[in-house]
């Protein structure tokens, strides 16, 4: 397959369904956007807590609160498939809304500025921001399925996986340095500004010709979206249960649990060992995590695309 350019087009149409390069660039950018809070809460905050002397139990609590919303993605999926503003496309209103909530929460928590020993508040911060991120993630998954033709699925999948990892890399490296030099509030603000950039792009593009850019703009729902929109909850529930408990889905369950357990343990153990045994600071851990994630992201795109 011919490799797609990741540069945002300037003179071509801003409709995702009509512009291949824009489609693929947007998929990459949106998945990178959801990696931004993950880099902060999976890597930088645990490292910051460990450097400040927090216990493994406290770090585990924050990591667990970060992961809880990701266990309930199906709820977000139900809501998006049932309710949306079709005149803006099936997914854009949810993506824009979720990212605005992410930005607002990060700004609020930058003002509140909980310390490394404020474990309950940090856990609630992680829970709130990641809940918004889950809605963004599910909406982007849906957008990817809606707009990518079959021949672009391989490249789209590589850009999705690699984009998220690169977003984590940028976030982990940047926020690790920000926390070390300026404090945690600066890291929250840095993440919020990165999400702002992604949000501006999503507001600029549209899914299909004739749709609205914003809720108050001129435009109308397209027939392909009207036909795809679910009118009742029951078919959605039946389809979700059928797919969840299919033989293929259940066969992946032990693998996913094993990967999740390993990942969670590493999120707690690595900062504890790095700070306790080697005396590393937040910026050093951020550089390590950022570099590792960047290499993984580039490799994913190169191999998968």
For each feature predicted by the language model, list its residue ranges:
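Juxtamembrane intracellular "pre-TM" segments in multi-pass secondary transporters
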Residues: 5-21, 209-251
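Symmetry-related core transmembrane helices of the 12-TM Major Facilitator Superfamily/SLC fold
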Residues: 97-104, 185-204
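Short amphipathic helix-loop junctions that connect adjacent transmembrane helices
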Residues: 37, 43-58, 268-286
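Glycine-rich segments within core transmembrane alpha-helices of 12-TM secondary carriers
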Residues: 69-73, 154-179
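A membrane-interface helix-boundary motif in multi-pass transporters
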Residues: 88-95, 118, 177-194
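Pair of pore-lining "gating" transmembrane helices in MFS-fold secondary transporters
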Residues: 14-52, 127, 245-266
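C-terminal ends and interior cores of transmembrane alpha-helices
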Residues: 95-117
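Transmembrane alpha-helices of Major Facilitator/SLC transporters
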Residues: 68-76, 287-305
């Amino acid at each position: 397959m011919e490799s797609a350019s990741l540069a945002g087009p300037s003179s071509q149409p801003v409709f995702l369904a009509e512009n291949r390069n824009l489609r693929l660039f947007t998929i990459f950018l949106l998945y990178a956007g959801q990696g931004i809070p993950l880099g902060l809460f999976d890597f930088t905050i645990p490292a910051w807590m460990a450097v400040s002397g927090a216990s493994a139990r406290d770090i585990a609590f924050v990591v667990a609160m970060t992961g809880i919303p990701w266990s309930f993605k199906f709820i977000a999926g139900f809501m998006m498939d049932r309710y949306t503003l079709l005149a803006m496309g099936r997914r854009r209103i949810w993506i824009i809304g979720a990212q605005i909530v992410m930005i607002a929460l990060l700004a609020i928590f930058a003002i509140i500025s909980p310390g490394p020993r404020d474990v309950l508040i940090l856990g609630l911060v992680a829970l709130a921001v990641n809940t918004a991120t889950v809605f963004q993630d599910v909406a982007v998954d849906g957008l990817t399925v809606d707009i990518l033709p079959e021949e672009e699925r391989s490249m789209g999948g590589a850009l999705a996986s690699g984009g998220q990892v690169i977003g984590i890399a940028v976030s982990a490296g940047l926020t690790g340095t920000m926390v070390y030099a300026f404090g945690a509030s600066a890291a929250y603000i840095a993440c919020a500004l990165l999400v702002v950039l992604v949000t501006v792009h999503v507001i600029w593009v549209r899914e299909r010709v004739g749709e609205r850019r914003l809720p108050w703009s001129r435009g109308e729902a397209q027939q392909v979206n009207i036909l795809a929109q679910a009118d009742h909850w029951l078919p959605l529930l039946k389809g979700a249960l059928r797919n969840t408990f299919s033989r293929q889905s259940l066969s992946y369950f032990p693998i996913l649990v094993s990967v999740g357990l390993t990942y969670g343990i590493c999120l707690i153990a690595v900062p504890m060992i790095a700070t306790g045994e080697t005396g590393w600071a937040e910026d050093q851990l951020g550089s390590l995590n950022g570099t590792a994630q960047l290499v993984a992201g580039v490799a994913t795109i190169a191999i998968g695309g």
